[in-house]
């Protein structure tokens, strides 16, 4: 089973703050133009090099999710971690990595007592997302426009899903949301293309770090080249908002990200 990326719409692209025009998709979005982490692979040990290069050259086949679940989860990921600013050749394969984790049974080593196993949680959660979409818009999630999809996901973020009550009694909404987001972030930022985006020079072993003073790039890294941009007009993610739910969550540390 393959995953196809649809055409990019102008209203899903980040906007240049000065011109007001959409910023076209590029091979490497972010503030580190021209930086290529894989260019440092000769400094890594063989085992590390094999693991990292495989993330680019060998995308896992879909073996856990059904075709319908892949289509739905891909649409969800397109809103949680949009990649419209990347050209088609440099999209990071999030769904295949989640699928591979579930198929091979990898987990963190613990499970909340009110949560089903991760695979079951995903199947239920995806059904729940579609139920909320149909309750709010009388259509499947994949049939909605981006500006309609975000409010559906927002109800999960706030632990107030509008629809699918029976499903959410089996998988707590806030727990599922954290599972979904943590898997998405893990898959995205484990990929060398994401490292290029944030200027991360890759594994330090066996070379080690040289610039131990705070905020300074290593000799093989590049200086940050910031520019002004605004979130896409269809996005609701321009600022951090506290999670809803029964379980306490801390706000993340750090600066605002790239687009």
Each language-model region and where it sits:
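Mature-region segments of soluble proteins
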Residues: 1-40, 51-58, 68, 72-75, ...
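Active-site-adjacent bridging/hinge elements
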Residues: 47-48
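Substrate-recognition/specificity elements adjacent to catalytic centers across diverse enzyme folds
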Residues: 62, 79, 83
């Amino acid at each position: 089973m393959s995953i196809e990326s649809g055409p990019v719409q102008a209203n899903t692209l980040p906007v240049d703050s000065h011109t007001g025009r959409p910023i076209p998709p590029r091979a490497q979005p972010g503030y580190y133009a021209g930086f290529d982490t894989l260019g440092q692979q000769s400094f890594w040990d063989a085992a590390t090099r094999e693991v990292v290069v495989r993330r680019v050259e060998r995308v896992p086949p879909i073996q856990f999710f059904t075709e319908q679940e892949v289509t739905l989860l891909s649409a969800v990921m397109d809103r949680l971690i949009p990649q419209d600013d990347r050209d088609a050749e440099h999209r990071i394969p999030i769904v295949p990595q989640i699928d591979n984790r579930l198929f091979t049974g990898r987990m963190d080593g613990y499970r909340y007592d009110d949560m089903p196993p991760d695979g079951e949680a995903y199947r239920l959660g995806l059904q729940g997302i579609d139920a909320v979409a149909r309750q709010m818009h009388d259509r499947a999630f994949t049939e909605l426009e981006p500006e309609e999809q975000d409010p559906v996901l927002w109800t999960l973020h706030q632990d107030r899903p509008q629809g699918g009550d029976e499903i959410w009694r089996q998988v707590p909404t806030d727990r599922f949301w954290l599972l979904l987001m943590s898997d998405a972030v893990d898959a995205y930022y484990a990929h060398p293309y994401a490292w290029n985006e944030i200027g991360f020079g890759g594994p330090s072993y066996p070379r080690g770090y040289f610039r131990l003073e705070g905020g300074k790039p290593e000799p093989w890294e590049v200086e940050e080249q910031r520019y002004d941009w605004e979130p896409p007009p269809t996005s609701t993610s321009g600022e951090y908002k506290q999670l809803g739910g029964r379980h306490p969550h801390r706000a993340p540390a750090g600066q605002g990200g790239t687009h």
